[in-house]
Amino acid sequence: MKRSSKADALLEALPYFQQFRGRTVVVHGGGKAITAAMRQENLTARFVDGHRVTDQASIKIIDRILTEVISPSLAAKIQELGGQAQVLSGKDVLVAVKAPPRLDVTGAKIDLGFVGDITSTDITQVQKLVDAEIVPIISPLGRGRDGQVYNINADIAAAKIAQALKAHKIIYLSDVNGVRRDPRDETSLISTLTPDQIQQLKQEGVIASGMIPKVDSALEALAGGVAKVHFLDGKQAHSLLLELFTDAGIGTEIAATK
């Protein structure tokens, strides 16, 4: 699999995390690769509030791409660089139920299909790997009590796992440079925000569409004990290093209210 710039940003930063005894868990998505695989099967990707509408054919493709392509590729590259990593399917970590319908832009209720809401987590294996200084590579898949596999929004999955692990920080790598006052203007980046300010921006419509699951999961993580959340542009060279090891940073940081 051709690596993305987001993967490059992660991989170059891992040795520095390990040098400073930082313990890292990777929860990844696979949006573009999944959409490309769906297109090969003549399936059209559709999103509602940042969630991919997932029918029976789609969930099989999503499971295959995440489990057989993206997770192993990330783990292999970490090992090539001298680190230790192990793939863990989200199906063995996240317990989920079918998500309720969402409203589209017209106000119509849309059945999301096999999209799941997380009801609980089992981090036993994740914690063992973290304690052994092995990087867990986790796919955003959940499993129902009946065995049904669900597609989980990766941002939400990361937040739930971070809360369960009592992580200090979550870093989201996306295709934008952070939260912007004007979503179309990358120079309108907001460097620091509080949870209250995030809620205000949502009410004003500044935060909308695909950013909603990201900021909602961030707020939930902060409320659940995570101290800080960072939003970075994974396409920017050295984005993780610049955010974490420079005074100014390059993305948006949201800190829990003390």
Predicted regions and their residues:
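Nucleotide/pyrophosphate-binding catalytic subdomain
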Residues: 1-235, 242, 248, 255-258
